A protein has these predicted regions:
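Signature of the SF2 helicase/ATPase Hel1-core->accessory helical subdomain module
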Residues: 1, 124-193
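Coupling/switch/interface segments within P-loop NTPase motor domains and analogous charged loops
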Residues: 2-151
Length: 193
């Protein structure tokens, strides 16, 4: 779901076929996602928030053991150059609203927390040597950024028909109030109204 800005450029076709899996497409906060998702976030955030290059690489590297391979992934991430402008713009609107909500609640906002992570990850460390507190904070923020991106993509998708192949694999999403369940129900019950 979070890769839609790089996969579909403009939803101007009569039919868009997008495949989702219950474990990876909807469960966003429990993990940092796959490399391509983080490379997409890198390109989105670096441009939109004017982030420092190397620290942002370090924050989003997560469990990729080889630093050079991760940096090559970012450098060679072709979709990062031609993202759907409407989704990108909508993502930063959603982020701004989320930041305003956090500030209203008296919480440190996600942008400030990400910049703080960039400071804390300003130099490269092997994953095994990163203190657990840094990993926990990083994973939480990446999960939040992915969740906001997923909601943004869901709104852009505007599905008229959702077909569940192997629907029994989605059953757990229909009857729970987790973030993944709420996101799935939002997709399944989308209305043009």
């Amino acid at each position: 779901l979070t890769l839609l800005p790089s996969i579909i450029n403009g939803f101007d076709r009569k039919l868009n076929f997008v495949s989702f899996t219950p474990g990876t497409s909807f469960d966003l906060k429990s993990s940092t996602g796959i490399q391509q998702e983080r490379a997409l976030l890198f390109h989105l955030l670096k441009k939109g928030w004017d982030l420092p290059h190397i620290p942002t690489c370090n924050v989003l590297q997560c469990d990729v053991a080889d630093k050079d391979r991760w940096r090559a992934t970012i450098k060679n991430y072709e979709p990062g150059l031609k993202l759907d402008k409407n989704i990108v713009d909508a993502y930063f609107v959603e982020l701004s609203q989320y930041i305003a909500w956090e500030k209203q609640k008296g919480l440190p906002d996600i942008r400030s927390r990400f910049f703080d992570l960039c400071t804390r990850f300003s130099y490269y460390q092997q994953h095994k040597n990163i203190p657990w507190e840094k990993i926990r904070d990083r994973n939480k923020i990446i999960g939040e950024l992915r969740a906001i991106l997923a909601r943004t993509c869901l709104k852009a998708l505007e599905p008229d028909l959702v077909i569940l192949d192997e629907f029994q694999r989605f059953k757990h999403l229909l009857n729970n109030d987790s973030d993944a369940g709420l996101l799935a129900r939002e997709l399944f019950s989308y209305s043009d109204e």
